[in-house]
Amino acid sequence: MYAVFQSGGKQHRVTEGQTIRLEKLDVETGAAVEFDSVLLVADGEKIEIGVPFVNGGKITAEVVSHGRGEKIKVVKFRRRKHSRKQMGHRQWFTEVKITGISA
């Protein structure tokens, strides 16, 4: 059984027991989280597609940790002007473990 849900402006395909990284959620470590914006639920041959969300669809997860991703370097370079600027960015994330999928 797998499901597709929406969180942080992105869509994620998950199965029960899977650990994934989402955009940062304001929830403490060890807390339970529920996602109601389920787009698709598939169980073997039975596939339920939402318009836009599945009625009664719910994904429960447990927050494992919070952290920051790897650094991305951004370079702004102006040719022939002897000018350059280098910046870095590390995006915050929340790691969750999927504990249940229901439709």
Curated annotation (Swiss-Prot):
Keyword set, alphabetical order: Ribonucleoprotein, Ribosomal protein, RNA-binding, rRNA-binding
Keyword field contains Acyltransferase: no
InterPro entries with a match to the protein in the record: bL21-like (IPR028909), bL21-like_sf (IPR036164), Ribosomal_bL21 (IPR001787), Ribosomal_bL21_CS (IPR018258)
Pfam family, one: Ribosomal_L21p
SUPFAM superfamilies, A to Z: L21p-like
PANTHER family assigned: 50S RIBOSOMAL PROTEIN L21, LARGE RIBOSOMAL SUBUNIT PROTEIN BL21M
Free-text function comment from the UniProt entry: This protein binds to 23S rRNA in the presence of protein L20.
Name of protein: Large ribosomal subunit protein bL21
Species name: Pseudoalteromonas translucida (strain TAC 125)
Top-level taxonomy: Bacteria, Pseudomonadati, Pseudomonadota, Gammaproteobacteria, Alteromonadales
